Amino acid sequence: YSEINCYQLALTYKPNYANAWTNLGVEGGGTVDGVKYSEINCYENALKFDAKLALAWYNLGVVGGGTVDGAKYSEINCFENALTYDAKYAMAWYNLGVE
């Protein structure tokens, strides 16, 4: 089994599994129940199910930002949110400084 296949299967059985959505995004996205999801879509879904998931916020920032619960978030907004939920997230601090 590949990592992508495992994440896709996990989401087939538990569609609200935020960590699986995040990991599927890290792998570049995938298909769940016949629907194709991009990296951005995966991170947005992860945050729909767990808005406090710092890794998903960070990764959404890395890919350019996105929309969560109808609100648009820039890269900077995403890194700031990641830091709200994990103040010691070194890479989020670094990327916030780069932006």
Give the role of each language-model region.
Residues 1-9, 30-45, 66-81:
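Structural signature of tandem alpha-helical TPR/SEL1-like repeats
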Residues 8, 14-15:
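Intrinsic-disorder/low-complexity detector
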Residues 92-99:
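Short, intrinsically disordered, charge-balanced linker/junction segments flanking boundaries
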